[in-house]
């Protein structure tokens, strides 16, 4: 079962890469042929893949861990990497997940609306000239509170930026609401069953 295998790999990555401040970033790319590609180098704040390993390949999964103390959401650098891979044709929007594993839980992004996502990637790749970077900075400067609040604030950033992305989130046992524990939640901030009513603002 692919879902069980993914969950097991995420759990292993979490215990290996998220419970120490001295751990380095780690993760993998899974290709459409089922091949797993692992980083050629990594530090506590960065990891890179060999261009020859990914050349001409389509990705179905791209998962990486932020070591202890790292954020529970993708950094702007992560969003640039995601946008670059899409721009270079590595991503089939209908069959792709991008995930960040942290000590707080796992956040997975899926592409819900490709035309909107395509425009978002162009804005992200515009860097300082784009709105996405400014809106991410606004989010980052104000983010705080509980795990749920920060997840909510990140989703508000995605919505404000018209990203075309949807979020799935699974908190670690030690964080988040008890009823969430160990369960994947699809978070649609436009619905009344969202994290909390503030997410709809």
Indicate where each model-derived feature is located.
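Non-catalytic propeptide/linker segments at domain boundaries
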Residues: 1-5
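Active-site-proximal loop/helix of nucleotide/amide-processing enzymes and allied scaffolds
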Residues: 46-61, 65-201
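Short beta-strand scaffold segments in enzyme catalytic cores
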Residues: 24-33, 97-101
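N-terminal carbohydrate-binding/catalytic regions of secreted carbohydrate-active enzymes
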Residues: 35-48
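N-terminal, Lys/Arg-enriched amphipathic/low-complexity engagement segments
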Residues: 8-21, 25-30
């Amino acid at each position: 079962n692919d879902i069980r295998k993914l969950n097991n790999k995420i759990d292993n990555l979490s215990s290996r890469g998220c419970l120490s401040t001295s751990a380095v970033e780690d993760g993998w790319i899974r290709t459409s042929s089922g091949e797993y590609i692992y980083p050629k180098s990594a530090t506590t704040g960065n990891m890179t893949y060999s261009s020859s390993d990914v050349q001409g390949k389509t990705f179905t999964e791209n998962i990486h861990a932020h070591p202890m103390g790292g954020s529970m959401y993708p950094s702007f650098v992560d969003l640039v990497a995601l946008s670059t891979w899409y721009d270079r044709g590595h991503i089939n929007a209908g069959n792709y997940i991008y995930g960040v594993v942290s000590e707080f839980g796992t956040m997975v992004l899926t592409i819900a609306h490709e035309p909107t996502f395509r425009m978002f990637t162009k804005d992200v790749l515009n860097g300082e000239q784009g709105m996405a970077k400014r809106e991410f900075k606004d989010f980052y400067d104000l983010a705080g509170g509980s795990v749920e609040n920060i997840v909510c604030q990140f989703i508000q950033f995605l919505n404000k930026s018209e990203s075309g992305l949807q979020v799935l989130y699974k908190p670690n046992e030690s964080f988040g609401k008890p009823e969430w524990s160990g369960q994947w939640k699809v978070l649609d901030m436009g619905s009344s069953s969202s994290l909390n009513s503030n997410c709809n603002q």
